Amino acid sequence: MLLLLARCFLVILASSLLVCPGLACGPGRGFGKRRHPKKLTPLAYKQFIPNVAEKTLGASGRYEGKITRNSERFKELTPNYNPDIIFKDEENTGADRLMTQRCKDKLNALAISVMNQWPGVKLRVTEGWDEDGHHSEESLHYEGRAVDITTSDRDRSKYGMLARLAVEAGFDWVYYESKAHIHCSVKAENSVAAKSGGCFPGSATVHLEQGGTKLVKDLRPGDRVLAADDQGRLLYSDFLTFLDRDEGAKKVFYVIETLEPRERLLLTAAHLLFVAPHNDSGPTPGPSALFASRVRPGQRVYVVAERGGDRRLLPAAVHSVTLREEEAGAYAPLTAHGTILINRVLASCYAVIEEHSWAHRAFAPFRLAHALLAALAPARTDGGGGGSIPAAQSATEARGAEPTAGIHWYSQLLYHIGTWLLDSETMHPLGMAVKSS
């Protein structure tokens, strides 16, 4: 009953915290500050975004094999009958309407953008899934992951902006390939699962208050780990729970490396990392938190430096940013302060939205309920070993064992509320972990 009441209390408080920022629209700085419409710049002829090859991890990913009508993977394709999209279908087989679900979702979003940008004009698809071998070897058209598009009026002066709208709609790679069309493609469904969520690999380490280090995957409620307050001062913070925990996950991580000192941090695209302002030489992180996917060489992250027995945070220049696929699991630890030192690099505990302070306030009800339960629930004794289990652990983990696998219910609640209240541009497209199909 106590846990049920706590959940109801959390839901009410979380909703109120998120609704208030969404409704506030007055002047000044704060959660309710209006976002100015983004100025859209047309793509130049032969430009592609992102600026990497199409079939790399940073774009739509590798080719996975041709899909035919007789293959087992044909069921991965779904027809698109959106009346706001014109399909050329010159083969007269309906093949151009077939595509993966991800491609369909992005195409439907783009169709709305096109009608908003040019009233009376629709999106036109000239090529979708190809079963006849008309494209180059290993083309993503053979998997239903690519489309070639124009506007219905075939006004070529619009194509640069059409490409930009495709980028904004969420296509994973957009190329102003020809003066006659724009080429767009998406990741494979299993690749999306590998890139989604906001986590660290299980092999990452944290520093414990009692000394030494511990693997992230081995953290338990009651552990106190090295973190930082909002002024950049190092301290030890209570580990509360995992916001996401997947032991068997195979994920694509961004590898952020510094040289002086030499440190390396792995985290998923949607996780937040603190970056120092250009004019800052001190240890205070301030409000600058970026998605890992936006961190670039030359920017500075915060690392632990030890000088004469004094340990403090200092900015260190990022030397390289690469991608690596690992099968070490995926873990998103939450501390009471909302920050954590992973592999000696300061990171946020949050992901999905690029506002650390928003996220930390949204978790205030969870922290409060955790503290109340820890105070109300007495530490219980583990009959097997004779030792006592901390109250915080017995309150939050029903079995007194390792934290529950999967995405934490409170994270899912906030995510769903956020999708109702926040602009889609506020949320990272790979923010919430998805299961591979």
From Swiss-Prot:
PROSITE patterns: INTEIN_N_TER. A lipid is attached at residue 198 (Cholesterol glycine ester). A motif (Cardin-Weintraub) lies at residues 33-39. Ca(2+) 2 binds at residues 91, 127, 130, 132. Transmembrane segments: none annotated. GO terms for molecular function: calcium ion binding; cholesterol-protein transferase activity; glycosaminoglycan binding; laminin-1 binding; patched binding; peptidase activity; zinc ion binding. The record marks 198-199 as: Cleavage. Keywords: Autocatalytic cleavage, Calcium, Cell membrane, Developmental protein, Endoplasmic reticulum, Glycoprotein, Golgi apparatus, Hydrolase, Lipoprotein, Membrane, Metal-binding, Palmitate, Protease, Signal, Transferase, Zinc. InterPro entries: Hedgehog, Hedgehog_Hint, Hedgehog_sig/DD-Pept_Zn-bd_sf, Hedgehog_Signaling, Hedgehog_signalling_dom, Hint_dom_C, Hint_dom_N, Hint_dom_sf. It comes from the Eukaryota. The record marks 244 as: Involved in cholesterol transfer. Induction: By retinoic acid. Glycans are attached at residue 279. It is an enzyme of class 3 (hydrolase). The record marks 271 as: Essential for auto-cleavage. Ca(2+) 1 binds at residues 90-91, 96, 126-127. Expressed in a number of embryonic tissues including the notochord, ventral neural tube, floor plate, lung bud, zone of polarizing activity and posterior distal mesenchyme of limbs. In the adult, expressed in lung and neural retina. One of its GO terms (biological process) is right lung development. GO terms for cellular component: cell surface; endoplasmic reticulum; endoplasmic reticulum lumen; endoplasmic reticulum membrane; extracellular matrix; extracellular region; extracellular space; Golgi apparatus. Zn(2+) binds at residues 141, 148, 183. Interacts with HHATL/GUP1 which negatively regulates HHAT-mediated palmitoylation of the SHH N-terminus. Interacts with BOC and CDON. Interacts with HHIP. Interacts with DISP1 via its cholesterol anchor. Interacts with SCUBE2. Interacts with glypican GPC3. Mice overexpressing Shh display digit duplications in both forelimbs and hindlimbs. This is Sonic hedgehog protein. The gene is Shh.
